[in-house]
Amino acid sequence: MRIGLFGGSFDPIHLGHLLAASQAQEVLCLDRVLFVVAARPPHKVPVAPAEARYEMTLLAVAEDPRFTVSRLELDRPGPSYTVDTLRKARRLFPQDELFFITGADAYRDVLTWKEGERLPEYATLVAVARPGYPLEEAPLPVVPLFVPEVGISSTEIRRRLKEGRSVRYWVPRAVEVYIEKHGLYR
């Protein structure tokens, strides 16, 4: 099988993430895409708790059989290092072809990650192209994934929510309801 591991904070997950996952699944002929929610990313501090981000991601992908949500990082103590996640995934899926998918902005600093230079040993690296982050400058070989630009970011969604503005059509409706119910990002 060909499995995509889509890593991110998903703080919150939004339609841009889902579009990127769908594009990755189609372009790379993936049998499935596992959303890997970062529990404790070492390079940034999430706003919402890990379990809330996990639950929102579950809600976001519930109706798409191509997508599942993984607890690979959530059930492991300590910081969420990508190399540890990929090692664990390689043990879980020893015969499968793995693709690690994340934004081009993240790959810019991949060599500062714990054992970042070793990531290609465990999975093919796939970078979702973003304006301002040329993939030619990526420090490790990556497969570029071009996704239509939607101009949606988790940062902008959190800002809008803090200002009391709507995020309808920015996130799946179930995620919007979850955010409202739990008073997140206020």
Curated annotation (Swiss-Prot):
The yes or no answer to whether the keyword Nucleotide-binding is present is yes
Q: Which domain of life does this protein belong to?
A: Bacteria
Q: Which UniProt keywords apply?
A: ATP-binding, NAD, Nucleotide-binding, Nucleotidyltransferase, Pyridine nucleotide biosynthesis, Transferase
Instruction: Report which reactions are catalysed by this protein.
Output: nicotinate beta-D-ribonucleotide + ATP + H(+) = deamido-NAD(+) + diphosphate
E.C. number, please? Answer: 2.7.7.18
Q: Name one GO biological process term.
A: NAD biosynthetic process
Where along the sequence do coiled-coil regions lie? Answer: none
Xref: InterPro entries: Cyt_trans-like, NadD/NMNAT, Rossmann-like_a/b/a_fold
Pathway, per record: Cofactor biosynthesis; NAD(+) biosynthesis; deamido-NAD(+) from nicotinate D-ribonucleotide: step 1/1
Q: Which GO terms describe its molecular function?
A: ATP binding; nicotinate-nucleotide adenylyltransferase activity
Cystine pairs annotated here are: none
**Summary of the function given for this chain in its UniProt record:** Catalyzes the reversible adenylation of nicotinate mononucleotide (NaMN) to nicotinic acid adenine dinucleotide (NaAD).
Q: Which NCBIfam families match?
A: cyt_tran_rel, nicotinate (nicotinamide) nucleotide adenylyltransferase, PRK00071.1-3
As for family, the record states:
Belongs to the NadD family.
- Could you tell me what this protein is called? Probable nicotinate-nucleotide adenylyltransferase
Higher taxonomy: Bacteria, Thermotogati, Deinococcota, Deinococci, Thermales
Q: Which gene encodes it?
A: nadD
